């Protein structure tokens, strides 16, 4: 190896070693946001996320078991949520799909899904029937939180959104 290659390696190596020293850590969320997170009027019988965490919601990142624990507890406390475990992660953690709506819509979820499936092929339904189904359906939004295992902010945000939707 010649001197030029050795110098290049030395520079790269010293930069990597010092990069941690040069990077300033970010502030905690309490320093960034003046408004309180989850500051609505909530149903008392539904536990606040802080009940499942060992810190205040928003101060730190919740771990997967805390999120699962909250979801499963909320499914017992509220008739506005249905939890379906659809798979396991590569670490054998449960993966959930949640349906959140009014109690009536949750109890009629199978019919709602059937009506949506009727709309999936325009060749098999006439306009009058399609319009009738559309008029009867609730608004539907698909919200996917964290499709990559190392993206924690989405799953953490889901905790607050779920609570807000079922408890407010």
What does each model-identified segment do?
Residues 8-16:
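Bacterial N-terminal signal peptides
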Residues 6, 19-168:
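M14 metallocarboxypeptidase catalytic domain recognition
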Residues 1-7:
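Bacterial N-terminal signal peptides that target proteins for export
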């Amino acid at each position: 190896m010649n001197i030029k290659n050795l110098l290049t390696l030395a520079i790269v190596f010293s930069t990597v070693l010092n990069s941690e020293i040069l990077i300033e850590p970010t502030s905690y969320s309490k320093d960034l946001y003046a408004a309180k997170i989850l500051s609505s009027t909530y149903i008392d019988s539904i536990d606040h996320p802080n009940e499942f965490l060992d810190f205040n919601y928003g101060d730190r990142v919740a771990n997967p078991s805390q999120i699962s624990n909250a979801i499963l507890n909320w499914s017992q406390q509220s008739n506005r949520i249905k939890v379906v475990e659809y798979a396991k992660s590569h670490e054998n953690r449960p993966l959930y799909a949640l349906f959140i709506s009014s109690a009536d819509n949750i109890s009629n979820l199978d019919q709602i899904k059937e009506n949506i499936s009727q709309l999936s092929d325009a060749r098999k339904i006439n306009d009058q029937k399609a319009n009738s189904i559309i008029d009867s359906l609730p608004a539907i939004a698909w919200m996917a939180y964290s499709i990559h295992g190392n993206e924690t902010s989405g799953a953490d945000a889901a905790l607050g959104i779920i609570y807000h939707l079922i408890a407010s």
